[in-house]
Structure formats: structure tokens, C-alpha cells
């Protein structure tokens, strides 16, 4: 028996197209979920590339020594591939319209301490979303 709530629910998708009235104003995004990195550390890298062109963002990410830069670079490559294959856009004409990091679940570990006590260590996860648009739509 299917409940009323399950009938109306839409399936989750990692690739979405948002179109306004203008055909050039299309936004393509890619999402990576459950990444084993602290959202706070990943956000600092995401803030550096927001609003930049794709080629400039790749240069910034390749020069960064942080683990978060590798994770965001992978999501950005996926978003660019989505734009090229699904929307027939050139990678030269893309910029990062949105880039944000959400908190994911945490898993907890016990760290033994002195005198029979224990501390709980929280290992954090995050969800990274990168959306790209055509530069022609920006102006």
C-alpha cells in the first residue's frame, strides 16, 4: 500500500537544469554528498572560487594545498561535464554562479581518557553543490 506522501514525492537528482525565460540563462549543477571533510574547512575553499570563471577556479584549486580543494575540484569537473554534455555549453564560457557547502551527518567515536572517562569525537561530513552558468547570461 502506497501512502499519499510517497505518491507526491519527486526523486532526488544530482543534475538539475534551471531555466528562466531566456534560453541562455541556464544553470547546471553537480552535487557531491557525504564527503568526509569538515564543512567549515570546505566552506573556506568554496568561498574563494564563488563567482569566478571556471578556468580561473581550476587554477586556484590546483594551487591550493588543502584536501577540500581536491574535493571541490572534482565536483566542479562534474558540473562542467554536465554543462558540456547535457546543455551543449562550452567550458570556456562558464562561470561559477553558486557554490555552497551544507552539513552532512556526523559519526561519533569514543576517545579513552584518564581515570576511566571517555570523550566523544565527532567526525563530520558535508554536501558540496557547485552550479555553473554561461558568461553571456551574466551580462
UniProtKB/Swiss-Prot annotation:
PROSITE patterns according to UniProt: RIBOSOMAL_L22
Any one GO molecular function term: rRNA binding
GO CC terms, sorted: cytosolic large ribosomal subunit
GO BP terms: translation
Composition-biased stretches (Basic residues): 9-18
Sequence segments annotated as region (Disordered): 1-22
UniProt superkingdom: Bacteria
Cysteines joined through disulfide linkages: none
InterPro entries: Ribosomal_uL22, Ribosomal_uL22_bac/chlpt-type, Ribosomal_uL22_bac/org-type, Ribosomal_uL22_CS, Ribosomal_uL22_sf
Coiled coil region boundaries: none
Annotated keywords: Ribonucleoprotein, Ribosomal protein, RNA-binding, rRNA-binding
Main function: This protein binds specifically to 23S rRNA; its binding is stimulated by other ribosomal proteins, e.g. L4, L17, and L20. It is important during the early stages of 50S assembly. It makes multiple contacts with different domains of the 23S rRNA in the assembled 50S subunit and ribosome.
Family to which this protein belongs: Belongs to the universal ribosomal protein uL22 family.
PANTHER family on file: CHLOROPLAST 50S RIBOSOMAL PROTEIN L22-RELATED, LARGE RIBOSOMAL SUBUNIT PROTEIN UL22M
Binding partners and assembly: Part of the 50S ribosomal subunit.
Protein name, entry field: Large ribosomal subunit protein uL22
Taxonomic lineage from the root: Bacteria, Thermotogati, Thermotogota, Thermotogae, Thermotogales
